[in-house]
């Protein structure tokens, strides 16, 4: 998928290439569930992945359900968060793609909490906290 913002049938995806030269893209998205909750997820996908393959790769979706509709603002915040923890993701994944999902977003303090689940470690969850200051505040005002 190309870098950008996708919106199709109440599914929102933001796609961004990773900087590791492995032809992978980081995708963060949200899907409305039948219960009117939102399934918010992130994952590392091959750059040639299609919209349908992302949406049908259930193994990649580790949900955090929320009643709050996701906004472009908080999805972009979550995506930017991964810039700061990208290396940590690869360290924990031992070279394999990690599954990441949003555990919580605190827009006032511009923090995004994510959980990383790695295949080689049996999907053991670990919490990573990422905090930002100036660049995130600029982004926050722009969106």
List the predicted regions and their residue ranges.
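Non-catalytic substrate-recognition and accessory regions of acyl/acetyltransferase enzymes
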Residues: 1-143
